[in-house]
């Protein structure tokens, strides 16, 4: 400008020429500021206060680049900061030199040199109040301030990025600078660490190759199992029975005696379970012989016999409730089991003719009637050669007049029961005195108006030789029939 002023011939030529040179110089400095905020330093692209991208202002007080919002907050501090717009103001040479010596990176080292992110938090840029409080802590109170003489600013070269210089404040550095000179040791460690991995993979693959596959072992085991049963893959293994050997359904097991004997449903003269009489000569309870002429007590289960001629009220009741016992064998049954009473083949106890005759244990009676309990008084019976009249004993059929005796059907269950223990005899067998036992009806007229002839079976499941009681007629000696 001085040179232009000297050359100007006129009085106003130097002023116009100096103004133009001033505008040209300011344009050069403004372009330099834009370069600083654009591409010369990467840290200047973001706001120093809120880290927002797109800086528009320059803080001449501290030498940083900020956004529009933070520029207004900086003006409100005490003392207020001097802020200029990058595109709408002019800059002088000292200002540009100061901005070149500072910038956001150097300002961070100075004003945030003692800042610890673990104890302090950067406020959110969307909350202006918190940002203002943060700026007051930073600039007014200088809470994290570090003197500039301890921080060296970056050196700039035209058209190139600046290289920061080591300072007292730690900053983010590459891994190579942290490790130092023996940096290749990291690669060596990586190679050594990768080597055991590869070796382990090799060992694992080798172990897998040496081990047989699991399905082959299973297949071998199954082949061995098939070989044990003869090599037939379709043969079923012979398994031992889980339970004891029991006969098949319907089979018969050998009789063991007692309650578990089920031979009553099969053929043969074996003893039945319920209500069967023992064979002749095998009475359950044999009474001991007593002297002749004495009255013999009946064993358990037998009822003493009462004479028919003695006028005994109990005998009358017994004769009223049940018919007379036939001379022949009367089949008696309880619970559907076949059992036949021998024809007056009771066990004779004693040796005299005056002793009473008792029945062996095992005979059963009708469950609807009770046996007549008479005292064993010996008496003379004109209808019996031994002088005794048989009475209804335990196990003998003595149905009352209200319960007619039913004749069993001719094919219901007769085939499934065994043969009678004693051969049946013809009903109305003549005794030694020439009269049958059925003549008792004539001896006691009026006491048994609905009596039936002797010899009719009371077992509904046995086939008897007599016909139906409704078809048969009583003897003609009864005046009521």
Curated annotation (Swiss-Prot):
GO cellular-component term (any): cytoplasmic vesicle
Annotated region described as Disordered, given as residue ranges: 150-220, 271-309, 431-481
Record GO biological process: acrosome assembly; intermediate filament organization; spermatid nucleus differentiation
Source domain of life: Eukaryota
Zinc finger residue extent: C4-type: 47-70
Domain Arf-GAP: 27-153
Chain positions found as N6-acetyllysine: 173
PROSITE patterns the UniProt entry points to: ARFGAP (PS50115)
Compositionally biased spans, kind Polar residues: 157-166, 188-210, 283-298, 454-481
A Pfam family recorded for this sequence: ArfGap
GO molecular function, one term: zinc ion binding
Annotated keywords: Acetylation, Metal-binding, Repeat, Zinc, Zinc-finger
Domain comment in the entry: Contains FG repeats and 4 N-P-F repeats.
PANTHER family in the cross-refs: ARF-GAP DOMAIN AND FG REPEAT-CONTAINING PROTEIN 2, DRONGO, ISOFORM F
Subunit structure: Interacts with EPS15R.
Protein name: Arf-GAP domain and FG repeat-containing protein 2
Organism in which the protein naturally occurs: Homo sapiens
